[in-house]
């Protein structure tokens, strides 16, 4: 038994080290790739100063943090709702953040500062997450809870479409493209949003014990002495914060929160002590690679990154559904 535990621990360490190395390689690729390939040896040149340090570095950091946040949000929500198919986009949390953002643009008539827009996006994500948690407390079946989340997402999407369709504001039309997901407008002025993500990401990665208990089910967690009301609400706030900040920075990006935790679980990383940091690293890798594809797929334009993640993630999602039905 002790030998098996040691083998499992070594295997987990190898996984985390491998993912860390892949994050480093994906970061280097993101900094080099673009309309002009800039090798690391040219990063200190005048061209490198502009393209790498002023344009690509803030974008790469934002992609890395948002990918980690979305994957962690998916892992936390799957433990919270005891449902392996939940994720922020599928349950409408991302759309809730979008509604908060568009409401801020409408009510503020485009005059609100960036930090106020970010806070409104966070508030929208929190409201939808709290509504979902309210549904979960009514002991709905997993399928009904999923349907409730999908319905909330559709309602939020409809509200955004109505607002954009009837608006004459150029800002709201731009938001329609932005809600498809993209990092094209990220620069150092959004650094406060990146900083706002870091402490929550670190805190979530340290909460393996309550999440392991929650993953056992509400009854088992209560029998083990976990204060359910406190931890559920705290994790809901943290998840809403991560999703809201991510949407404020890059728009709605789907499937990262669903696919990444599933893939890692299929690889044997079921303990949240390993799953949480693994999700953060793997989410960062996936979104960095998707961002590189979005930048390089078209010669004279940039694909919305939400399109790339949906194209790659939807087939995986269907496969997971079929696998869970067996």
Curated annotation (Swiss-Prot):
User: Which protein family is named in the record?
Assistant: Belongs to the binding-protein-dependent transport system permease family. FecCD subfamily.
Which stretches are transmembrane? 15-35, 61-81, 88-108, 112-132, 146-166, 184-204, 240-260, 274-294, 302-322
InterPro entries (alphabetical): ABC_BtuC-like, ABC_transptr_BtuC, ABC_transptr_permease_BtuC
Q: Which gene encodes it?
A: btuC
Task: From the Swiss-Prot or TrEMBL record, give the protein name.
Answer: Vitamin B12 import system permease protein BtuC
Q: How does it sit in the membrane?
A: Multi-pass membrane protein
Pfam families for this protein: FecCD
Major subcellular site: membrane
GO function term, MF aspect, one: vitamin transmembrane transporter activity
* Biological function: Part of the ABC transporter complex BtuCDF involved in vitamin B12 import. Involved in the translocation of the substrate across the membrane.
Query: Which UniProt keywords are given for this protein, alphabetically ordered?
Result: Cell inner membrane, Cell membrane, Membrane, Transmembrane, Transmembrane helix, Transport
Please give the SUPFAM superfamilies that the UniProt record associates with this protein. ABC transporter involved in vitamin B12 uptake, BtuC
Spell out the subunit comment: The complex is composed of two ATP-binding proteins (BtuD), two transmembrane proteins (BtuC) and a solute-binding protein (BtuF).
A Gene Ontology biological process in which this protein takes part is: cobalamin transport
State where the protein is found.
Cell inner membrane
> Which top-rank group of organisms is this from?
Bacteria
Annotated PANTHER family: FERRIC ENTEROBACTIN TRANSPORT SYSTEM PERMEASE PROTEIN (PTHR30472), VITAMIN B12 IMPORT SYSTEM PERMEASE PROTEIN BTUC (PTHR30472:SF29)
Q: Which GO terms describe its cellular component?
A: plasma membrane
């Amino acid at each position: 038994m002790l030998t098996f535990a040691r083998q499992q621990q070594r295997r987990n360490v190898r996984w985390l080290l491998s993912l860390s190395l892949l994050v480093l390689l994906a970061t280097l690729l993101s900094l080099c790739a673009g309309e002009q390939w800039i090798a690391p040896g040219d990063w200190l040149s005048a061209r490198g100063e502009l393209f790498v340090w002023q344009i690509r570095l803030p974008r790469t950091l934002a992609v890395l943090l948002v990918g980690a946040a979305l994957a962690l949000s998916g892992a936390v929500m799957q433990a919270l709702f005891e449902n392996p198919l939940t994720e922020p986009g599928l349950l409408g949390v991302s759309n809730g953040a979008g509604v908060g953002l568009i409401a801020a643009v409408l009510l503020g008539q485009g005059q609100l500062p960036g930090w106020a827009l970010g806070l409104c996006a966070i508030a929208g994500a929190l409201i939808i997450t709290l509504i979902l948690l309210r549904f979960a407390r009514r002991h709905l079946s997993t399928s009904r809870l999923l349907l409730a989340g999908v319905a909330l997402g559709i309602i939020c999407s409809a509200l955004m479409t109505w607002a954009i369709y009837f608006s004459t504001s150029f800002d709201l039309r731009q938001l329609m493209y932005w809600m498809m997901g993209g990092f094209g407008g990220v620069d150092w002025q959004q650094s406060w949003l990146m900083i706002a993500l870091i402490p929550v990401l670190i805190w979530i990665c340290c909460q393996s014990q309550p999440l392991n208990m929650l993953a056992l089910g509400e009854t088992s967690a209560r029998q083990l002495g976990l204060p359910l009301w406190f931890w559920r609400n705290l994790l809901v706030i943290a998840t809403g914060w991560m999703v809201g900040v991510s949407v404020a920075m890059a728009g709605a990006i789907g499937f990262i929160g669903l696919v990444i935790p599933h893939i890692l679980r299929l690889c044997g990383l079921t303990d949240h002590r390993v799953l949480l940091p693994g999700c953060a690293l793997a989410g960062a890798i996936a979104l960095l690679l998707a961002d590189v594809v979005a930048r390089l797929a078209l010669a004279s334009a940039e694909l919305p990154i939400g399109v790339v993640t949906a194209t790659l993630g939807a087939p995986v999602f269907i496969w997971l559904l079929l696998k869970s039905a067996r």
